[in-house]
Design a protein with these regions (language model features):
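Glycine/proline-enriched, intrinsically flexible loops and inter-domain linkers
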Residues: 1-195
Length: 195
C-alpha cells in the first residue's frame, strides 16, 4: 500500500506507481467483449491509440425494432485505502466519486441514481464489529443527502471473514444516469495542448 502522507520522495512515487490499485486494467478488460449488442458508445480505452482508460461505461439503451440516441452512463467509486481508515469517509468518497465520473463522461447528476455493493467482515456476535457497516451506511446516506441522489438498490454481504482474515470495509457506489449518445465525453486529450 502506498503512503498517504505529504512527502514527495522517489520512494513515495515508486510505491504509488507499483500499487495494485493504480496498475493497468487492460488484461482484465480484454477478457470481456464490450461490443456485445452493438450499442457501445464508449469503449473501455479511448484515444487514437486506445491507451486512455475511460472513467465510465456508456451504451445506447437496447430497443426492439427501433433505434435511440439515449445512452445509459454508469461509473463506480471506491477507495480501499480511505475505506480501511474510515468506512464513513470511504463511503462518502465512493458516492461522490461515482457521480463525478458519470458527470465527467457527460451524464446528468440531476438524473442520477445509485446502487451499492457492500462487503464487510462477519460480526461474529461482537457489537463493535457492527460499527464498520453502520458508519459506512451513515457516510453513504450523508453523501446521498448532500448530492441529492438516492440509492435505489444494493447488495450486501457480511461474510467477509475466513478464519482470522477479514476483508477491508467495502462500500462500492455505482452511479447510473442517461445522456444523449452524441454528448458522451471520453477521457483522452482532444487536441495538442489540451488541459
Amino acid at each position: 500500500s502506498y503512503s498517504t502522507g505529504r512527502t514527495n520522495t522517489a520512494k513515495d512515487w515508486e510505491s504509488l506507481v507499483t500499487d495494485l490499485n493504480v496498475c493497468s486494467q487492460r488484461g482484465l478488460v480484454q477478457r470481456f467483449d464490450s461490443t456485445i449488442g452493438g450499442a457501445t458508445v464508449l469503449m473501455p480505452f479511448s484515444g487514437r491509440t486506445q491507451q486512455t482508460p475511460v472513467q465510465a461505461m456508456a451504451a445506447k439503451i437496447p430497443m426492439i425494432n427501433a433505434t435511440t440516441s439515449t445512452a445509459s452512463v454508469m461509473a463506480w467509486g471506491f477507495n480501499p485505502a480511505v475505506s480501511e481508515q474510515s468506512p464513513y469517509h470511504g463511503a462518502v468518497c465512493a458516492v461522490v466519486e461515482s457521480i463525478a465520473k458519470v458527470v465527467a463522461a457527460g451524464g446528468d447528476s440531476e438524473k442520477c441514481w445509485l446502487t451499492f455493493q457492500e462487503y464487510f467482515e462477519r460480526t461474529q456476535g461482537k457489537a463493535e464489529r457492527w460499527g464498520k457497516p453502520f458508519s459506512a451506511l451513515l457516510g453513504a446516506y450523508k453523501a446521498q443527502l448532500e448530492m441529492e441522489c438516492g440509492a435505489i438498490g444494493g447488495k450486501d454481504s457480511m461474510s467477509g471473514t475466513f478464519e482470522d482474515i477479514d476483508v477491508p470495509p467495502t462500500l462500492v457506489s455505482f452511479a447510473v444516469s442517461t445522456a444523449k449518445a452524441e454528448d458522451i465525453i471520453s477521457a483522452e486529450f482532444k487536441c495538442p495542448l489540451s488541459k
